[in-house]
């Protein structure tokens, strides 16, 4: 037998769920790196967790290390020996090389060639050694490599970790790993584990991976998080069937309850129906954020919107048989939470949205208050309303009035008691308060949708009206924060400006709104007139960089369009997609190299050209028939009215044949300077026309 199963359990105090889940994804990679570092070839690696333990299970862990050779290269022989033919031995420099390696016999030194030079050389052979001596150092290095964001110290221990470590249990090939002192964390190892607290508080000895799994299973610890998740989902499904309800599975919440339980049980509790008068989002948010409960809904047909049911699912970690006691305890806690929510909500309803003291809340240091932000957004919103009036299906005067009102009260709910308690309900509570205070329904809905989209694939504002309010918020935040230098760099983006920018582009693209990233940004910056001066090209470039996330496409095609003067968001997307369609077309896929060879040459000829240089040319100076042929084909395109981008691109790429013939027969760098200049100007004109679609030199095929 050359290998055996290795199991390592790291027993800790309760791990914070979110920190554990974030780092769990990185653990296999980090463990693999430690094995590779020591040239250990192992089998499958599995990592399990519960709130109290990390378990590393490695199949086919070798009993012995591999024999390895370590090579050392010293100084060149000609400066390390007393003479060039090496007969008089080593000088001080040569002796120093071997002394550093701890070698005393220098009589029979070796040499090797490195970088075409003969140098002193020594090879050290590392014999096979038992791997059992490597296990604890690997585990301790693994613990140091883990990054949970925060760590703590306890007692007089040397090292820190996210929570105190109580034991490291190593089970491998019947070896004894008891009583190894781990000074770094202040304990001695035991080949033992702990089980569910309701079963025992004591260590239980184990002598093999098989015994370890049996002990946990018998004592209500489900080690594998996938099995805990499956148990929860199965029990939820049974509750749905039994009680004729539907349960919305929140993925993040499910991951969290899996991470905080060792033996989960899904139980159904109820709350007083009187609480259903609250907006449903208050109830579901309170249940999720405060108690980690799943919301339940009345079962309806697929066409109907789900209605909140006065039930909740609590995932318990208890193993006692009296489930009703657990349910009653959770019902009591939820009742107190929802009673508080009713109090906050009713207090908020007494306060008119107009009266919210926005001037008392600082937006960002150096950027004024929420009232200042609201006033800036109002100017942006008026500009956008006039620009997109045809898409609003109402008279311009009415649209301007409603948009102004929406922006005026959009931030009022930030000062409400409910949003103070649940910040994720900003905008949503504004919607409910606006409806209760008889605001226009479009206005109310725009308050709810102003922060959309919340993530990459999240819903967008449901109308152009809401889109205008959402865009105003985003544009002001970008102008404001860029103007005071709060620009994202590297992984740092404290104001989530990348996500905000992506949302801005996605809204504009979805509704097909005209927005030029050069002209409109400049106009808005000047119209608002209160931002600190900064280079708008920095913001323009920042927004252009988001297109790679916006369009699923070969990045070089996106780059080719962005490398032109086109800055209208919708037109950029249309051109990228049209180029992609052309290049993906099976009839073009086989001849891409042929299509691009002439165009690449055209681009290379013009790569150093000054864009502002005159491109006038005269056909009277054309001497070759291929010049006339290319001009006629080019002129036919320039004077044609195309139905759309697809036919225009098809026509431009149709120039590849006359271009090929041109380059075969025409010498661009003619001895006659006038003819040379004329040919260059003509080719520049052809290239410039291509830039109406994309910069062909950027496209990688």
UniProtKB/Swiss-Prot annotation:
Q: Which Pfam family, giving just one, matches this sequence?
A: tRNA_synt_2f
GO molecular function term, any single one: ATP binding
Under InterPro entries, the record lists:
Gly-tRNA-synth_bsu, Gly-tRNA-synth_heterodimer
Subcellular location, principal:
cytoplasm
List, alphabetically, the PROSITE patterns matched. AA_TRNA_LIGASE_II_GLYAB
Superkingdom as given in the UniProt entry:
Bacteria
State the EC number(s).
Answer: 6.1.1.14
Q: Which NCBIfam families match?
A: glyS (TIGR00211)
To which protein family does this belong? Belongs to the class-II aminoacyl-tRNA synthetase family.
Q: Which reaction does it catalyse?
A: tRNA(Gly) + glycine + ATP = glycyl-tRNA(Gly) + AMP + diphosphate
Give the UniProt entry's GO cellular component terms.
cytosol
Can the keyword Cytoplasm be found in this entry's annotation? yes
- Protein name, entry field: Glycine--tRNA ligase beta subunit
The UniProt keywords, alphabetically, are: Aminoacyl-tRNA synthetase, ATP-binding, Cytoplasm, Ligase, Nucleotide-binding, Protein biosynthesis
Q: What is the primary gene name for this protein?
A: glyS
Q: Which PANTHER family match?
A: GLYCINE--TRNA LIGASE, CHLOROPLASTIC_MITOCHONDRIAL 2, GLYCYL-TRNA SYNTHETASE
Species this chain originates from = Helicobacter pylori (strain G27)
Q: Does the keyword GTP-binding apply?
A: no
Q: How does it assemble?
A: Tetramer of two alpha and two beta subunits.
- In its UniProt record, which GO terms are filed under biological process? glycyl-tRNA aminoacylation
Entry's localization field: Cytoplasm
């Amino acid at each position: 037998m050359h290998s055996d199963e290795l199991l390592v359990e790291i027993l800790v105090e309760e791990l914070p769920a979110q920190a554990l889940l974030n780092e769990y994804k990185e653990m296999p990679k980090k463990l693999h790196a430690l094995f590779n570092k020591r040239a250990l070839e192992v089998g499958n690696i599995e990592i399990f967790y519960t709130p109290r333990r990390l378990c590393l299970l490695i199949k086919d862990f070798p009993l012995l290390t591999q024999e390895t050779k370590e090579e050392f290269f010293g100084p060149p022989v000609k400066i390390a020996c007393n003479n060039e033919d090496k007969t008089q031995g080593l000088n001080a420099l040569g002796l120093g090389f071997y002394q550093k390696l701890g070698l005393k016999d220098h009589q029979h030194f070796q040499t090797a060639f490195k970088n075409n030079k003969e140098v002193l050389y020594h090879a050290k052979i590392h014999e096979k050694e038992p791997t059992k001596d490597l296990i604890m150092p690997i585990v301790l290095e693994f613990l140091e490599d883990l990054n949970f964001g925060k760590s703590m110290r306890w007692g007089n221990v040397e090292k820190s970790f996210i929570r105190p470590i109580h034991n490291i249990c190593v089970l491998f090939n019947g070896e004894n790993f008891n009583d190894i002192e781990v000074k770094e964390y202040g304990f001695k190892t035991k080949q033992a584990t702990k089980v569910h607290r309701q079963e025992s508080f004591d260590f239980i000895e184990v002598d093999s991976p098989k015994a370890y799994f049996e002990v946990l299973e018998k004592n209500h610890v489900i080690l594998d998080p996938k099995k805990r998740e499956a148990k929860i989902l199965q029990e939820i499904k049974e509750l749905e069937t039994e009680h004729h309800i539907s349960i919305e599975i929140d993925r993040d919440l499910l991951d969290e309850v899996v991470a905080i339980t060792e033996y989960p049980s899904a139980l159904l509790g109820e709350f007083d129906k009187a609480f259903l008068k609250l907006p449903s989002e208050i109830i579901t948010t309170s249940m999720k954020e405060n108690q980690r409960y799943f919301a339940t809904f009345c079962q309806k047909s697929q066409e109907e919107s789900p209605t909140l049911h006065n039930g909740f699912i609590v995932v318990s970690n208890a193993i006692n048989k009296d489930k009703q006691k657990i349910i009653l305890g959770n019902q009591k806690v939820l009742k107190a939470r929802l009673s508080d929510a009713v109090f906050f909500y009713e207090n908020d309803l007494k306060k008119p949205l107009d009266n919210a003291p926005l001037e008392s809340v600082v937006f960002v240091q150096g950027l004024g208050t929420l009232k200042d932000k609201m006033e800036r957004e109002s100017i942006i919103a008026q500009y956008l309303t006039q620009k997109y009036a045809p898409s609003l299906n109402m008279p311009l005067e009415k649209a301007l009035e409603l948009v102004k009102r929406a922006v005026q009260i959009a931030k009022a709910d930030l000062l409400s008691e409910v949003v103070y308690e649940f910040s994720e309900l900003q905008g949503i509570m504004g919607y409910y308060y606006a409806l209760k205070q008889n605001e226009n329904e479009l206005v109310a809905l725009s308050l709810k949708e102003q922060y959309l989209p919340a993530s990459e694939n999240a819903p967008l504002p449901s109308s152009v009206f809401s889109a205008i309010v959402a865009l105003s918020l985003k544009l002001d935040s970008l102008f404001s924060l860029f103007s005071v230098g709060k620009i994202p760099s590297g992984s740092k983006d404290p104001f989530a400006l990348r996500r905000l920018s992506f949302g801005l582009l996605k809204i504009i693209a979805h509704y097909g709104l005209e927005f030029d990233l050069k002209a409109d940004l400049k106009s808005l910056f000047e119209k608002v007139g209160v931002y600190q001066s900064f280079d708008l090209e920095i913001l323009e470039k920042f927004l252009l960089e988001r297109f790679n996330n916006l369009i699923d496409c070969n990045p070089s095609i996106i780059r080719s369009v962005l490398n032109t003067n086109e800055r209208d968001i919708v037109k950029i997307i249309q051109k990228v997609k049209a180029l992609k369609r052309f290049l993906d077309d099976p009839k073009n896929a086989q001849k891409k190299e042929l299509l691009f060879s002439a165009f690449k040459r055209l681009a290379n000829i013009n790569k150093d050209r000054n864009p502002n240089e005159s491109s006038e040319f005269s056909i009277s100076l054309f001497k070759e028939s291929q010049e006339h042929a290319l001009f006629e084909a080019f002129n036919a395109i320039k004077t044609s009215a195309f139905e759309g981008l697809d036919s225009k691109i098809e026509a431009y790429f149709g120039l590849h044949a006359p271009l090929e013939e041109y380059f075969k027969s025409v010498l661009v760098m003619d001895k006659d300077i006038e003819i040379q200049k004329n040919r260059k100007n003509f080719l520049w004109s052809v290239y410039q026309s291509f830039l109406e679609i994309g910069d062909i030199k950027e496209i990688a095929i």
